[in-house]
Design a protein with these regions (language model features):
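Conserved, well-structured interaction surfaces
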Residues: 232-239
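Compositionally biased, proline/threonine/alanine/serine-rich low-complexity intrinsically disordered stretches
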Residues: 30-161, 736-760
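Sec-dependent N-terminal signal peptides
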Residues: 1-33
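Hydrophobic alpha-helical transmembrane segments
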Residues: 222-230
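An acidic-aromatic substrate-binding cleft motif
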Residues: 175-179
């Protein structure tokens, strides 16, 4: 995301590709700090990664603070509310690549992070903490009342016994009803949403860290651009852009929650989530595609359905109206968020634009037809049944849509936190769930019957009954995760398919073959959306009759990356580049000062100015024929199209032990591991280390196709097109592998009662 049309980096000047802002990279997978791996551990900019210094006391390290400048109430997000700050002086030239004029008499900063103002002293307006200085204390932004933020280094743990809520928090809850309230009458829709990408949007530790890194590198001027899609409620509440989700309002944590769509009353269009939510408690009207005909029937029978429509009345609170809002059934409504265009003109995501120009749109198919229908990824009709269960009484049947929205993202966090589960929320707080060791088998007979009586559990889990209750909830969570994983496999298999294997040569002189990879959809490219960070790739492995590997492409380095130019092991010349790699991951290209371009993982320019800013462009890209700062090189497969992956096994690689066979795996992974190393400087939520995040991202990736073919001795074209049964088949492996319960160790295990943002 070169969100910044700024001065070119020092790295760009020399073209060496070194990253100025060093970032922590996850240790090699499967290695321990005491091991001697070969090849050597990854380094960044030639410097071995060092863990952050541990705190001097048992107090958790402070979470990375919110950006130093709170957003203003207007839309530009570039000017703080109070006090008014002087606008930065622009360069005299139009390309915005020149340095800012220095202050009279001030010398440039000598440090190389280029984030300090001139003179090398911290920005007085930013204070000692803030997003530019993540090790400093956390401060309450100016638009929050005193006492709203926890003390430095402490994230409060809310006990289940804390039933009292102050009046202000109660009002916030009323303005933005939680999905858990909607679940009372809409259990089907709630369950589908509970494990959806929409529900996970704000909980994702990868997203939150990426948002914070971008804001840090842009001196806070990116504002809420990214996060306002992920939690419109949180931004309406003026929450800090970057803070632990444990600090956020309950509805804010729900990401794209019920009211994000059903409390919108205007047709905004492609506004990158710059829309307004209608505020009000659960009694206020909702907005839906069908209007209020069924609701009127319910309201006309209050004795039957036991509903109330006025505050203070005894009964089941219900919204008083459903206002018919036709755009909810139109593709343009999805374009509110799914076309992401930055204020500087950079086109980051183009899912809706791709659809708008697709064959599917020309045929009259909508986004909702394929993504809310009976079968993920295909126009397959909709369900029919009661839209609500009011008490134990169903409402009259009508068209039903699927709110799962299965796609490429998946959860890497504790199953007590996600999927959303009302019983889990009632049993324990998020921080308490983080201390429940489900992988050790807590709450299972196998564990509890062998656990020592003196084992020291965290306070919330001292009771064996509570541990059994937690395990029962988690069993339901595991079921939900497998459910959405199956839907994810279906939609990925629907979109990306292996259609043919063309064997061109197989003799003593070598082996040549090609694989046809097709976009089987007509609605948009594959991948789409955030395609520059989607690690979709082919693994091709050729073995002889004895099982010895003679050729491999698409294999991973010890960090979990494939061997392209962004692999740290390739970058450091510890592994060769995979010249046969087939990947659908688009690339960010940044402009060098001499006019060339190079790939950059997170293309936020390292400005020559003391403080980089996100600024609107001063001229149209069409005038120059190129972006002045960065661009995205798309390698996605267009709708209904295909690409060939070509491979060649040299003569000297053959063993003479024919027949040879090739195994083809197509893998979809939500982000590459190298991105995690690039953004790790600000830490990850829930106390997760970069290695934990990287391991989970890799371990839960999907092998959507796995085919083995014995290579014939003569040239031939082999059809690999999958059947409908193949598309709908179960995944090759479970989504979440829970370790077998082991007897508890006899020594006490100390578990902190606070959960910090990790910098380790």
């Amino acid at each position: 995301m070169d969100f910044l049309k700024l001065s070119t980096s020092c790295a760009a000047i020399c073209g060496c590709g070194l990253v100025i802002l060093a970032a922590s990279l996850p240790p090699a997978r499967g290695q321990t700090p005491d091991s001697s791996p070969a090849p050597a551990p990854a380094v960044i900019s030639g410097t071995p990664v060092q863990p952050a210094s541990p705190p001097a006391t048992t107090t958790a390290p402070a979470p990375a603070a919110a950006p130093a400048m709170p957003a203003a109430s207007d839309d530009d997000l570039l000017v703080p509310d109070k006090p008014k700050a002087a606008a930065p002086t622009a360069s005299s030239d139009d390309d915005l690549l020149g340095p800012m004029p220095p202050k009279p008499g001030a010398a440039a900063s000598s440090d190389d992070d280029l984030l300090l103002p001139q003179g090398g002293k911290p920005n007085a307006a930013a204070g000692a903490g803030g997003v530019l200085f993540p090790d400093g204390p956390q401060r309450a932004p100016a638009n929050l009342p005193p006492g709203s933020m926890p003390p430095a280094g402490v994230i409060p743990v809310v006990s289940t016994g804390d039933a009292a809520i102050d009046h202000a928090k109660m009002l916030l809850a009323e303005k933005y009803p939680s999905a858990s309230i909607c679940a009372t009458c809409h259990p089907k829709q709630f369950r589908e949403w509970s494990f959806s990408q929409h529900a996970y949007a704000q909980l994702s530790p990868v997203f939150n860290t990426m948002q914070a890194t971008i804001d840090k590198r842009a001196s806070g001027t990116n504002g809420d651009f990214c996060i306002r899609c992920h939690t419109a409620v949180g931004m309406d509440l003026k929450e800090p852009v970057f803070t632990s989700n444990l600090n956020r309002n309950a509805t804010s944590r729900e990401g794209i929650t019920c009211i994000t769509c059903h409390r919108i009353r205007e047709n905004y269009g492609k506004v990158s989530a710059r829309f307004g939510l209608v505020q009000g408690d659960i009694l206020q009207p909702m907005y839906g595609p069908k209007g209020n005909a069924i609701l009127k029937q319910v309201l006309a029978q209050p004795d039957v359905f036991q509903v109330v429509t006025k505050p203070g009345e005894a009964g089941r609170a219900i919204h008083t109206d459903v206002v018919k809002f036709d755009p909810l059934e139109k593709s343009a409504f999805c374009g509110d968020c799914h076309d992401v265009n930055l204020l500087n003109g950079f086109r980051l995501e183009e899912a809706f634009s791709q659809f708008h120009n697709s064959p599917a749109n020309k045929e009259g198919t909508t986004c909702q037809d394929c993504h809310m229908g009976n079968t993920p990824g295909i126009k397959s009709g909709f369900g029919f049944g009661p839209a609500a269960m009011v008490g134990d009484k169903p409402t009259p049947s009508r068209k039903l849509t699927n709110h799962t929205f299965a796609g490429p993202d998946y959860s890497i966090i504790h199953p007590g936190l996600f999927p959303f589960n009302t019983k889990a929320q009632e049993l324990a707080s998020l921080a308490e769930w983080l201390t429940f060791d489900y992988q050790a088998g807590w709450g299972t007979d196998a564990y509890e019957k062998t656990a020592p009586a003196d084992f020291a559990y965290p306070g919330r889990w001292k009771s064996v009954d509570d541990r059994y209750d937690a395990r029962a909830i988690l069993d339901d969570q595991f079921s939900r995760l497998e459910d959405v994983n199956h839907q994810r496999y279906q939609i990925m298999r629907r979109g990306i398919q292996l259609h043919a294997l063309n064997v061109e040569q197989n003799d003593a002189g070598g082996i040549k073959f090609k694989v046809k990879v097709a976009n089987n959809t007509l609605g948009h490219g594959v991948p789409t959306g955030f395609d520059a960070e989607r690690a979709y790739f082919m693994q091709a492995t050729v073995t002889d009759r004895l099982g010895r590997v003679v050729f491999r492409s698409g294999d991973r380095d010890p960090n979990g990356d494939y061997r392209d130019i962004e692999s740290q092991y390739v970058h450091d010349w510890k592994l060769p580049m995979d010249k046969y790699l087939f990947t659908l991951q688009s690339k960010f290209l940044v402009t060098l000062i001499r006019g060339g371009e190079r790939v950059q993982i997170l293309p936020s320019n390292k400005s020559l100015d003391p403080l980089p800013f996100v600024r609107p462009p001063t001229n149209a890209d069409a005038l120059t024929g190129r972006s002045p700062g960065a661009r995205k090189q798309a390698v996605v497969i267009p709708p209904g199209s295909s690409r060939w992956a070509s491979y060649e096994v040299r003569r000297d690689q053959l063993t003479g032990q024919a027949p040879y066979k090739v195994n083809l795996k197509f893998i979809t992974q939500m982000v590459p591991v190298n991105l995690l190393g690039e953004i790790a400087e600000v830490g990850f939520d829930y106390g997760m280390s970069p290695k934990q995040v990287g391991d989970a991202v890799v371990d839960r990736s999907q092998t959507i196709w796995d085919k083995t073919v014995v290579l014939p001795s003569k040239p031939v074209m082999i059809d690999l097109t999958p059947s409908e049964a193949d598309v709908l088949a179960p995944p090759y492996k479970p989504f979440l592998t829970v370790a077998a319960p082991a007897p508890a160790a006899k020594q006490a295990v100390k578990v902190a009662d606070t959960t910090p943002l990790s910098r380790n």
